[in-house]
Amino acid sequence: MITNQTERLNFASTKNIPDYPDFLDVQVKSFKDFFQLETKSDERGNEGLYNTFMENFPITDTRNNFVLEFLDYFVDPPRYTIQECIERGLTYSVPLKARLKLYCTDPEHEDFETIVQDVYLGTIPYMTPSGTFVINGAECVVVSQLHRSPGVFFGQSFHANGTKLYSARVIPFKGSWIEFSTDINSVMYAYIDRKKKLPVTTLFRAIGFERDKDILEIFDLAEEIKVSKTGIKKYIGRRLAARVLNTWHEDFVDEDTGEVVSIERNEIILDRDTIIDKDNVEEIIDSNVKSILLHKEDNNQADYAIIHNTLQKDPTNSEKEAVEHIYRQLRNAEPPDEETARGIIDKLFFSDQRYNLGEVGRYRMNKKLDLDIPMDKQVLTKEDIITIVKYLIELINSKAEIDDIDHLSNRRVRTVGEQLSQQFGVGLARMARTIRERMNVRDNEVFTPIDLINAKTLSSVINSFFGTNQLSQFMDQTNPLAEITHKRRLSALGPGGLSRERAGFEVRDVHYTHYGRLCPIETPEGPNIGLISSLGVYAKVNGMGFIETPYRKVTDGVVDLESAPIYLSAEEEEGKMIAQANIEMDASGKITASNVIAREEGDFPVVEPSSVHYTDVAPNQIASISASLIPFLEHDDANRALMGSNMMRQAVPLIRPEAPIVGTGLERQVASDSRVLINAEGHGTVEYVDANIITIKYDRTEDERMVSFDADEKTYNLIKFRKTNQGTSINLKPIVRRGDRVVPGQVLSEGYATQNGELALGRNLKVAFMPWKGYNFEDAIVISEKVVRDDIFTSIHVDDYSLEVRDTKLGNEELTNDIPNVSEEATKDLDENGMIRIGAEVKPGDILIGKITPKGESDPTPEEKLLRAIFGDKAGDVKDASLKASPSLHGVVLDKKLFARAVKDKRKRTQDKDALGALEMEFETKFVELKDRLVEKLFLIVNGKTSQGVMNDLGEEVLPKGKKYTQKMLYAVEDFAHLSKGQWVADDATNKMVNDLIHNYKIKLNDLQGALRREKFTITVGDELPSGILKLAKIYIAKKRKLKVGDKMAGRHGNKGIVARIVRHEDMPFLEDGTPVDIVLNPLGVPSRMNIGQIYETVLGWAGMNLGRKFATPIFDGASLDEINALTDEANVPRFGHTYLYDGGTGERFAQKATVGVIYMLKLGHMVDDKMHARSIGPYSLITQQPLGGKAQFGGQRFGEMEVWALEAYGASSTLREILTVKSDDVIGRAKTYEAIVKGETMPEPGLPESFNVLMHELKGLGLDLRLEE
């Protein structure tokens, strides 16, 4: 039999809804594309890690004698499993190695041979299959960043006098920013790196448009007139467009070098914009200039007035002057020579070493400016600069529009892969610098690539990224939804992004391009609102980092239902008419409605079907996963929906979770994509099941058995009470039985907020909306004792407590159960290592781990000397440093672990040597067995066939072409792991089998080698622990938390409240048939909050409970009122849930009908046990001597100035004096008070508070001579 999955009655009217993409694709795919490990080295694309290496290599020394070239990179398998890393507090990482080639180009070093070496570059954190990283034992997520895309942006601002100022900003991927902007005098300036401004014409001169003539010709503003005595007179009255210059060369002798240097001199004869008259004509003719430039007499002169104004402000006349002027502005110094000055511009914008627009920047630039520059040209070109200036002039003349920087075509996503690429770039650039330095130092020595490279350089950059970067975050692991949402989050904060303080309203607001890409609902409520958002359910990030969403193509009013949906970015969607997913259409996809409401950018016109270009693929396309899990979301106010989607992430996994009766149909996908559950990999039969393991025997064909080295049975280990980051627990249990048949993808386990393969964050409860004796005033909740008694909202929380054993100056610390001055009763549960036994009940103050630390030696007293003389041993030279249970800890010891480094003494070394020898022999035996099996299987496949010439990785022929395969010939092959994938025999089917067999052999061999390496390491080193730590003891304690007064609960519609009273079951209001309700909510919490979805859910839930059915009501396409009424009638439930209730205390009927039904409630992570706290005596602050604050410090309550005023107002002087002295920082007074209470004496007089002394010291620090006198 096959265990049947929950079938839900789906109310969706939209048909042909495509499957959701893998929800973790945004993390997993990005990381895969970055590392490209599954791609052959010669087929790797120019992206990710490969691209970063190619950008930084080859590296040469300063004389270009030695060259270090990059050939390839690869990684070794990780040393520890993911779980071992979490337990030991290590990073789950892989060793990265690069194959480098060092050769010499200098003929003098003929003896230097070319060296190819594999060099270790450090360990790199590696992504787990569920899209997380384990850093120092904690699971982390690298959040994708939404930042401004590289390219050119045109904007406007307003001067204080109201003038509009326009600007164009070029943002590169790497390099200096350049900005062009206008001022109130209509002059255009260029700013480089936001430093000093220079007229844009100076920049033109510097990039090769040297003369005024060249600049004016760019914009077609001038005509050139040949100077002749007769011809020039007809131009009297026209205006000069450029200066008339007299140019000559002067020779002078350089005093330093003695060389004769020629210098160009310019004399201005007539300035720009001079109107030619008779006198000017003579000057022009006398100056011997060949031609002059005049303004063109046409209409577009006015548009380009800004260029003429800028030329007037331009202090330079030639390219040389321009580059020198720019050098002076940027460097605040005189240029040493013209070459250096010219080099600064080339380096800034035209050198691919310093400047890079990136593929995205070039694409955006070409698109915006309508250019056709090749995509691989990723530096600025002259054409770019000219076109930007032209566009800016169009903008000034209202012939073009400014950019909307919040449009998603101007914002792109930097996924994990790209962020890592950037960090690797930084690390490799640092490494390249040190390599260059080492090459220069070791000029005449023989050296190898290993000598040049310091592995720490790269790993320190990567580790600091994971450890300190704002986007590398401690994963929210409260429940599977919290995990999946965290991995799909997009943040506008972080390095290179916005800051909370500077982000305005526009950036945070919902934009029309967010449709289907970013969720308009799910965002935090605090200062980060709108800056952190979530991907839509169907959204994908394309290769350039832009978010795409799918649509179905519409041609002449017919929707294409057959083809796969087309993914469009925000830019591609511009100007398209897009209809909703649930428009009326027939089976062939023809739109039947005469008019449809469509969406075009930010408008919603009603159009004919023939005008529609695309339709949405699904009604929930607009929302994120969390928002899509709220049934009847369309009936809720957006603010409450936001709270609902945020609170579902805080739901604590319960002992017995239950999937909602009223769901949205997305629950199964979330549970499976969270990667927590175990799924069957194929068709098979369950062989064995218990609480810890499930064994399945898979059906296999003969061919599959032939190419595999694994048995048909596969055993899956179930996770038992594993601690999550937030202290909730993952505990899986099987849902299949022995003998069951399974199909591919079938869920085999449940738990961790899932039931039967569906997300199950809470429980379905019978609810009544009515006031109950004032206990549910202001969102409070009244709940039945039955809910607590039946463990409906009971959850298990796991905490781990660890203690490190260090090597101190006075000697080693020690774990032991023999602790000085502690009773036998206190140590009865400790083992010989001082660790508490599994199953022991823990209460505050209990010893969890016993540890003693050597005490500092002081001169012994005569008594101590006598004791030592009698007993021999140093009595009491150790102190108790045990770990004790904190004040609020009640629980049961779930597990304990002890990690220790290997001890290095002579006996241990001998034992290690024997153990390593045995390991090697065992490996050798297994390896020979594996190779024998491979040869047997290979021979069965290729028996009687002829070799096609099999090569190894080095290109050598291992199995000669034309020879018939024999067993002896196959046994002779030494290394099957390094055979290249190729043609073994003539037919393809056999070749595929052989290649699959060798592929599986390599996997098996890798596993064997990895196990050998791990076991060797364990024997020689022991457990890997941070430096200075000899042992690490860990205790896991489970706490069972029942629902209590003060716990926070919520529904899925933003309806949250605190449990105010747990009422006896028999006192709860009951229905006509005598059934008491489980929970009573305040009806006044509904109308003002406008979240009517909870009422729809309540009524439909009651019908579902009575009928024993579950429903899927997708958002924006859910059950209508008529459908709900039909079901309530069928279930014999009153319409709208209106029914009379009876008082549980008196049995009398209440006067009014109330809404009754079944609602899905969650218990949130804000539990009263974590917040309740009381203190009598405890730790004090060192300087002020006042009690510390907060539960974590076992602190007190701050009695602030307002509280003091309150007591003053009551005239409670004695209470006030007590609070400000003995209860706070009167050190002597509080000790005396404690003594008086213990002895039962009268309270002493308070003394002087320590804070008064602090004030005195501060005043003395100001140089005031302060003395207290009686």
Curated annotation (Swiss-Prot):
Superkingdom to which the source organism belongs: Bacteria
Record-listed E.C. numbers: 2.7.7.6
Top-rank EC class of the record's enzyme: transferase
Listed GO biological process terms: DNA-templated transcription
Catalytic reaction(s) noted: RNA(n) + a ribonucleoside 5'-triphosphate = RNA(n+1) + diphosphate
Keyword Transcription among record annotations: yes
GO MF, one annotated term: DNA binding
Keyword entries, A-Z: DNA-directed RNA polymerase, Nucleotidyltransferase, Transcription, Transferase
This protein's GO CC annotations: DNA-directed RNA polymerase complex
InterPro entries assigned to the protein according to its UniProt record, in alphabetical order: DNA-dir_RNA_pol_bsu_ext_1_sf, DNA-dir_RNA_pol_bsu_external_1, DNA-dir_RNA_pol_su2, DNA-dir_RNAP_su2_dom, DNA-dir_RNAP_su2_hyb_sf, RNA_pol_bsu_bac, RNA_pol_bsu_CS, RNA_pol_bsu_protrusion
Family note: Belongs to the RNA polymerase beta chain family.
Assembly and interaction partners: The RNAP catalytic core consists of 2 alpha, 1 beta, 1 beta' and 1 omega subunit. When a sigma factor is associated with the core the holoenzyme is formed, which can initiate transcription.
HAMAP family reported in the protein's UniProt record: RNApol_bact_RpoB
NCBIfam families membership: PRK00405.1, rpoB
Task of the protein: DNA-dependent RNA polymerase catalyzes the transcription of DNA into RNA using the four ribonucleoside triphosphates as substrates.
Protein name: DNA-directed RNA polymerase subunit beta
